């Protein structure tokens, strides 16, 4: 007599879910690759909360506290003394060689552009690239490229005007956060339309899809236990317990 096992239906459903997730992940990865090829660089889009919108300019790894980056008077005098020592002990060629060595170790600049609607565009540049490349990228991804805009850093608020400067000279290496501003009109209700176009905003959902398949795959193989082995293991443990001598027994 055939008995319908509900566990088989559960297993089939899991396999279908895994297949669908893998197909969605593969499609999302393909779209992300197409966007990377279209824009000529690796980009990410994510949404940040208003609490995390603290004006700062940091590297791509935000692990240190604010006190770590505070410039104290002691740091100033130490830096001044170091500069005087460098001028007296090092020739111009030596300083240039050291600067070139430091620069050669830095291979990328991770720039995050934060928009007023809490969306952040992250793009990777080479330190020797010009800031004009960032301006051109923003023009391609905003929803209204015809509306004039500008980028600025803070604090203090300083508009970026020299687009011919490279990221290294601007101090944007290994990473920096810049802010976007324009004269985009707001609705009567006070809400504004998205600053990024729909195509680039879709990257936020696509990246989530590529990560969503990972926990599903981890549960794709249900744990199977050989029922015949359970009593044997239990019996072996019981035997071991019986053969063990009590602590109080002495020969």
Swiss-Prot record:
Annotated InterPro entries: PUX1, Ubiquitin-like_domsf, UBX_dom
Pfam families for this protein: UBX
Protein name (record): Plant UBX domain-containing protein 1
Organism per entry: Arabidopsis thaliana
GO cellular component labels: cytoplasm
UniProt region (Disordered), positions on chain: 212-251
Keywords recorded for this protein, A-Z: Acetylation, Cytoplasm, Ubl conjugation pathway
Subcellular location: Cytoplasm
Any one GO biological process: protein-containing complex disassembly
Listed GO MF terms: ATPase binding
Lineage of the species this protein comes from: Eukaryota, Viridiplantae, Streptophyta, Embryophyta, Tracheophyta
Principal localisation: cytoplasm
Compositional bias segments (type: Basic and acidic residues): 232-243
Gene3D superfamilies named among the record's database cross-references: Phosphatidylinositol 3-kinase Catalytic Subunit, Chain A, domain 1
PANTHER family linked to this entry: PLANT UBX DOMAIN-CONTAINING PROTEIN 1
Job of this protein: Regulates CDC48A by inhibiting its ATPase activity and by promoting the disassembly of the active hexamer.
Disrupted-gene phenotype: Accelerated growth of various plant organs including roots and inflorescence shoots.
Compositionally biased intervals (Polar residues): 217-227
Gene (UniProt): PUX1
